[in-house]
Swiss-Prot record:
It is an enzyme of class 6 (ligase). Its main location: cytoplasm. Its EC number is 6.1.1.4. ATP binds at K613. GO terms for molecular function: aminoacyl-tRNA deacylase activity; ATP binding; leucine-tRNA ligase activity. Keywords: Aminoacyl-tRNA synthetase, ATP-binding, Cytoplasm, Ligase, Nucleotide-binding, Protein biosynthesis. It comes from Streptococcus pneumoniae serotype 4 (strain ATCC BAA-334 / TIGR4). NCBIfam families: leuS_bact (TIGR00396). The lineage of its organism: Bacteria, Bacillati, Bacillota, Bacilli, Lactobacillales. This is Leucine--tRNA ligase. SUPFAM superfamilies: Anticodon-binding domain of a subclass of class I aminoacyl-tRNA synthetases, Nucleotidylyl transferase, ValRS/IleRS/LeuRS editing domain. One of its GO terms (cellular component) is cytosol. A motif ('HIGH' region) lies at residues 41-52.
Amino acid sequence: MSFYNHKEIEPKWQGYWAEHHTFKTGTDTSKPKFYALDMFPYPSGAGLHVGHPEGYTATDILSRYKRAQGYNVLHPMGWDAFGLPAEQYAMDTGNDPAEFTAENIANFKRQINALGFSYDWDREVNTTDPNYYKWTQWIFTKLYEKGLAYEAEVPVNWVEELGTAIANEEVLPDGTSERGGYPVVRKPMRQWMLKITAYAERLLNDLDELDWSESIKDMQRNWIGKSTGANVTFKVKGTDKEFTVFTTRPDTLFGATFTVLAPEHELVDAITSSEQAEAVADYKHQASLKSDLARTDLAKEKTGVWTGAYAINPVNGKEMPIWIADYVLASYGTGAVMAVPAHDQRDWEFAKQFDLPIVEVLEGGNVEEAAYTEDGLHVNSDFLDGLNKEDAIAKIVAWLEEKGCGQEKVTYRLRDWLFSRQRYWGEPIPIIHWEDGTSTAVPETELPLVLPVTKDIRPSGTGESPLANLTDWLEVTREDGVKGRRETNTMPQWAGSSWYYLRYIDPHNTEKLADEDLLKQWLPVDIYVGGAEHAVLHLLYARFWHKFLYDLGVVPTKEPFQKLFNQGMILGTSYRDHRGALVATDKVEKRDGSFFHVETGEELEQAPAKMSKSLKNVVNPDDVVEQYGADTLRVYEMFMGPLDASIAWSEEGLEGSRKFLDRVYRLITSKEILAENNGALDKVYNETVKAVTEQIESLKFNTAIAQLMVFVNAANKEDKLYVDYAKGFIQLIAPFAPHLAEELWQTVAETGESISYVAWPTWDESKLVEDEIEIVVQIKGKVRAKLMVAKDLSREELQEIALADEKVKAEIDGKEIVKVIAVPNKLVNIVVK
């Protein structure tokens, strides 16, 4: 057989690995450890798509490589299985979300195993397993005990179609929900919050110690949004009321000509004049219908209403009208801003729209034309005139503190984490509310608080979750006869994914989250690979929980993930018509290398686009494995380009990878393999070992595969293959194409053992040095010959070889040699007449 029969070979080795528990995590503590983590998937009904295996293949290559290097490797997989889609499906079909989830997991697992990933399935976790979420609930009770989980009446992002509130992070820029694209409105509700803000400074500072891309670190820094400035107190004219504004530029206070409160600010109703009451009430209602993102969109038209009240500017005693406007959020800062229209573009546009005064306090611009937002010396600012920004800020803060109307302040953009969902399919929050007004956490001995099985999972309609309908589960009585009600909100999907990497370390422990010694052995995660879409939410939440567990003494490290790598996106093929509208692939036909709309006949433009069901351009890995084999899919996805690049899927590229594997198969099975080395492949073999080793370490898998191709090309030119080089090459390709490598290893090594733990090959540095060198021979200054000669020959030897060359002899025949200039390792110049 001259080709690689994947349909026979791949299932054979998958069966072998499963039967022999080949990838069971090593426990020899004398060995170094390597923990390779994938972002575990949500097991959707659609199954795996070809984007999933890209990251999984990368961690699998590293895991197989490290095993061969003698490491204990922890390479696990599990399921982030709570979440809205399963519940939505259950509501639409009447099926149990648990059954639906179990079916999806079985399908995902089948697909993953068909790709030959070296997971230790003994460590599989599932966030919906009560033995798992017992510890999610335990972490919550600890947060509650420490005052980091609390209830608050807060305006939430309510999605009527989903029957639940969602976190700020789950609202898209257009003001719709990330899941489903439904309208989001603001609505006050009793919610559980987690005090992530208590960890803001540590979450910010500890980013510096992590081997993460700067772009991801910057996204987290921006989300945390640390600002240093001052709180300034403004009194409301004619009342005993006052409000506080946080500003990063207290030095511009002399240019503050009006103030703006969030429509929800507690002072609004108290200070609004009777003449303005109706307009204010209308505006407040309109603002409540918009999401935070829609309200703060810089491009939107400025709207606002004057309250009829005035604030007093503390630095000059001037009256400043107090407005309300929806671009100010009650949840951000103090819910109030001082407007300096001369030096802030949004304030300038607002002032122009409503004819409010603009006072320049920094020189350098023309504030009648636009806000001047650069720095300049202070003007029109009394005791700050002539000062630069830094000096002016220091002086005004000292003045405010001395007068008792302000002080220096650090704030964060980060808000506390909205932790409740009004849905059924999530972890029950282990809290009981008693009729005497107290609340207590469910004792640890009673955890897990198991999610009750029910067919009635529709939202209750009251804003509570469907659990509010389950009276038997809901109502409890204390030993002293006091009645209570269980918390009906459930946890968000982020809960289970915030600590799952810890449970992999000790997944069957019934006494604690994980054993301390095992946590010490395995943490931190050495490499975490996943999509950049989780840059803020999941990674920030997991870091927060990890730091909290560090403070409790549960985990030994301050950070969970030492190195993070975001793989790029695998794009599908899309087609657009002349209007730029996308056309589904089943409406496209190819003729003479061009693409046409089946129905209209219009020629279409081909371009990469995100794979989606609607475009019918999603590639199912099952189809690829069936036609080309898992090893082809693995090699192709790693060879497409750099791991972090977004690249379009190509059937031709897939075929190229398959042809390469067939060439590898033929090389090893048809070449004569000998115990003696004739030295012909010394250099290319040692170059290949060195390059592949270094490129796997630096995650440059595409260039590693390119080097393997170089070796195959060189080896194919030789009649025979040295056995040690054949073995070494098979080991080098094993992390990329493990099924093929196992099969070829049996033909060459004949041990009957798996290749998985055979020591990784090493290279001989001395074999990388060129033994021969090319020199040029010039006659009368023109190159007449190029010769391969031994390196470092003397002038005399070089001259002798050059003059003996047949080509050179023919050129100088019948001519007198005047002089021969020989430069070792470079050239021979012959002067004749």
